[in-house]
Amino acid sequence: LDSILSRPQAYTFWRIMKGGKGLPEKYEPWNSAMPAWEDSLSKEDVWKIITYIYETAGQWHAKPGKQDPPSLERGKQVYLEKCAYCHGEGGKGDGPSADYSMPQPRNLTKGHIKLRSTSFGKIPTDKDLFNAITKGMQNTTMPGWKHLPKNDRKSLVIFVKSLSKKFEKFKKRGKSHKIIKVGKPPASSKESLERGKELFMVQCSGCHGVKGRGDGVATQRVVDYSSNAIWPRNLSQPWTFRRGNSKKDLFKTLRTGLSTTAMPKFSPRVFKDEQIWDIVNFVTTLAPPAQPKMQSPIHAKKVEGEISEDFNAPIWKQAQASFIPLGGQLQTKPKSYFPTVRNLMVRAAHNSKEVALYIHWDDPSLDPKLKKFSAVEESPQPPLPEHLKGHEPEEPLEAATPEFPDSIAVQFPVSLDKQKPYFLNGDAEHPVNLWKWSTATNNAVEFNAHGLENWKKQDELSQVVKVKASYEYGQYSLIIKRKLKVIHEKIDIQFQTGRPIPIAFNVWDGYHEETGNKKSTSSWFTLWLDE
């Protein structure tokens, strides 16, 4: 939005109608994921969108003028203009956009929000509500509204409180908020990490899994998309945390819990501050110190001899790991608005005869069909602490078998000498070659595609890709190999050293009913085979 105000609205209309794919080549359209909307939206709808974009961008850059004092009336006006589309006019979370949100918008009539400075189940403070409005909720459809005038945000706090009877009752009874205090984080130590690991395995791994990837056995009971019960947070990706990923943020989340979710509070009556800090210290070891940066090109180092299919082999430990972000496919129905798999890591190597990719990605829901073919390590049932044990032990649940398999496809252009194909599985003039692995068969199948709707499986003589797969504690790992040169050059990528090779990825989460066009996709990246 920083640059949109410097462009004429006619330019924006053109971009929306034509998308990235329809723009002239000099604008590098193949690097744009922007779909063309000329066949989906009317001209009138596009101009309404443009009006909204320019008005919103203008608000971000406008200098604040004189503001009226915060009021209920102003709060209602701003709420109906900005918030009711998701939260509904009455605040019940049933606005027209609710079906396109995951998790669904907060039911404000209940008086609860996830991120508070108060204890689990208690109403938030005015400051908590103001912060939620200002900052939004990271990785959800709830945006931050810091561009709104401060008094408008304060007015929203007043109006939001009017939607629930709990705030008025709280005031009439003369109650005051009990704020959770967070002290200075103590230094980590070997002893603290050992204590934290023991506490985590007993108290947290049932939901978050032993590696923190959200694959704990309790998810079979608490996760249900149809009821809006979402997966436990993937603790190995702290850049996705709603509140933040500082040690103080983690401490506060543990002490307050997340109201209306399965994440409980860790009460001071049961857990001392020292124990909470021990858990925090251990949790920080489950993730890299910062979000990995995109690495392109993906370097395939030249090695001698056979390329190992052992995931722990030195060749893979020494190879450069490239972080590849993924997003939901949104151009063609069925669309993937909220994909589970948001990124993957890839390494590469070649030996002048074969090229191999080692790919791993987090998926908290194992497809149990893979157990027939490959090594699988699932997070075990943790030993329950005494205060949580019931009179009768719970019967373990059988893992549900999803209707669709988990899958991944690696995509290349068929020809390196022609214009790069459209990143969404090519186009009519520029086909792509795909290697698709699936848990259903544990095989890689080669396809050619001329777009999302035009895939064709190659015949058996062309199926020469080899794979090895495993699943360990919420993460799939795959080694996929093929010869550099094969005989079917009209339908298969022919690898060359010392030149850029476009590469892209598609991922399907079968538990989330992803199949066909409903999937995560990457844009084009570059693979480089060292000479």
Model-inferred region functions:
Residues 1-53, 100-160, 221-284, 435-439:
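Extracytoplasmic electron-transfer domains, predominantly the class I c-type cytochrome c fold
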Residues 12-18, 49, 69-88, 188-213, ...:
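Sequence/structural segment immediately N-terminal to covalent heme-attachment motifs in c-type
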Residues 51-56, 63, 78, 82, ...:
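Aromatic- and Gly/Pro-enriched helix-to-coil junctions and flexible linker segments
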Residues 52, 145-198, 210, 282, ...:
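Extended surface/linker regions that mediate inter-domain or inter-protein docking
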Residues 56-59, 164, 287-289, 510-514:
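Short acidic/polar inter-strand loop motif in beta-rich domains
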Residues 58-78, 167-200, 290-299:
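Electrostatic cytochrome c docking/interface patches
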Residues 61-64, 88, 95-99, 142-145, ...:
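Short, solvent-exposed loop/turn and secondary-structure capping segments
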Residues 289-531:
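Structural preference for beta-rich elements and adjacent junctions enriched in aromatics
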